[in-house]
Amino acid sequence: MTGVQTCALPIFKELASKVESGGKPVIEDQAFREKLAACEIELKALELTQLRVVADEGKHGKGKPNPASSVLKIKGSEIQQTTTELLMEVIGPFAAPYDVHGDDGSNEAMEWTAQIAPSYFNNRKVSIYGGSNEIQRNIIAKAVLGL
């Protein structure tokens, strides 16, 4: 789950250094950099948690799932959604590159942006499929907290 996001973040940084918003590259926006840094930190924490879960795999009863897998699912889906949100923020108005009646053509979109918005909306489902994040939290509450 972390591989795609790990590969995508450097690409997002490069795009953010090329795409301008308000006359300056998006990467120079302090709020954007803070969101990007938070996403990178969350991604690194998820990678380390995955390694711990794999290392501890033999400690759980045979056939019993590790409750930490629910944590991985929740955090992984949240990070996946965050990365697509960051990409949407980078491309800004280019997210809708289609000609609109009366458009003077001044908003020339980059060709690749046509797939970004559909991908963003498609990725909203990741917190639902495979068991919603709320269900995963209930699993954690029962297995770990005994609630």
Feature locations, PLM:
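Single conserved hydrophobic/aromatic residue that forms the stacking wall/gate
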Residues: 1-7
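Alpha-helical interface subdomain recognition
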Residues: 8-147
